[in-house]
Amino acid sequence: EKADEKASQGIIGGLFGMRFPFISEGAMPCNNCLSNDALFKVQSDVIRHLAAERSCVFVGRCADYILREHPRCANVFISASKEDRIARLCGMHHIDAEAAEEMIEKADKRRSEYYNYYSFKTWGAAATYHLCIDSSSLGIDGTVRFIEEFVAKKLQL
């Protein structure tokens, strides 16, 4: 698969077309569908527009690549040990470790394929981000504080 997102124009039109009139011409290629590439274009337009208007936090969607020329952008990649990821999913979704591990593998594969296809970079590669952090080392709260401090220093806030 070229990307992990598929949606109908009706959904996208309702979410973006009405609220975000800045979406460029040609982003909606047909009446009943939205291709993966067109969806990426819509998402890119929305991300750029929002980042130009205000401070934002974007999770995924190749936002680091889309905003690569933005002067006030901090790109962070958060990882965690497989054990911590499995334990978190088991607790959140009340599933067994095997199901959690399968979910992780599928999600990571989709994320990697999507990111690598649209950004022409490698998902998770340290050189792609300003900061890479393993949340297993500091815990979730410690990781949040560390990232807040990093962003404040990087952007001179």
Segments predicted by a language model, with ranges:
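Conserved nucleotide-binding/hydrolysis micro-motifs of P-loop NTPases
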Residues: 63-64, 79-85, 138-139
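Long, contiguous binding/interaction regions
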Residues: 61, 82, 95, 106, ...
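Conserved phosphate-donor/acceptor-positioning beta-strand/loop module used by diverse small-molecule
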Residues: 69-93, 97-105
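Short gly/ser/thr-rich secondary-structure transition/capping motifs
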Residues: 37-41, 56-60, 113-117
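RNA pseudouridine synthases
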Residues: 50, 63-69
